């Protein structure tokens, strides 16, 4: 949500949009907001990005990004006050006027996911690479080992669940420890998500995970 203004706008305040039907992640912006000059259609505007989100639709079909209202103060000249009277009386011809700005709503069409979906599909959509490592690769009976699965790329990584790993039956296993190394930016969500599985083999032998 970006505000454009041709006048001296101050004390800007805006609400939070109701982004129903989307998984949202807000891009962190400076708390202290100030207008920056920008040319648009041949005119110079004071602009400020109020809020910015990365959106992941949770259903297909037509969806609406709602409008929100902003309130601000505009300083403008009061034509009912004589400038000469104001000068000699120590007053001002300028007055503060409260203004309401409405950001228009947007509509988008969300295509369904390809079908048939894999039976183990968990909802992760994007471009991902996956790698795995076992540390150590040789252990003694009843010693712990760690299987690390690293998923890197970009997409809705916050919604990504831990992969299901089929350990040998006589391995004692524990829930995955999840390390989130993703960042939210203008291009979306990207980075790494690391899943560490601790397992303890109870019998000697050679096993495949």
Residue ranges and their predicted role:
Residues 2-208:
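Regulatory and interaction patches adjacent to catalytic/ligand-binding sites
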């Amino acid at each position: 949500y970006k505000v454009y203004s041709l006048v001296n706008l101050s004390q800007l305040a805006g609400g939070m949009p109701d982004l129903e039907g989307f998984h949202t992640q807000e891009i962190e912006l400076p708390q202290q907001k100030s207008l920056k000059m920008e040319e648009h259609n041949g005119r110079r505007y004071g602009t400020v990005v109020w809020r910015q989100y990365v959106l992941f639709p949770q259903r297909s079909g037509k969806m609406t990004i709602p409008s929100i209202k902003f309130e601000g103060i505009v300083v403008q000249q009061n034509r009912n006050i004589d400038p000469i009277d104001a000068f000699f009386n120590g007053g001002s011809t300028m007055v503060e006027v409260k203004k309401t700005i409405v950001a228009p709503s947007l509509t988008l069409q969300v295509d369904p996911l390809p079908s048939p979906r894999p039976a183990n599909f968990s909802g992760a959509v994007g471009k991902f690479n996956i790698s795995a490592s076992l540390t150590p690769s040789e252990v003694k009976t009843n010693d712990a080992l760690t299987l690390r699965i690293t998923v890197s790329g970009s997409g809705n990584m916050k919604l990504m669940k831990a992969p299901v790993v089929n350990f040998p039956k006589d391995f004692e296993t524990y829930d995955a420890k999840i390390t989130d190394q993703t960042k939210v930016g203008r291009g979306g969500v990207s980075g790494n998500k690391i899943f560490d599985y601790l397992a303890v083999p109870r019998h000697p032998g050679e096993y495949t995970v």
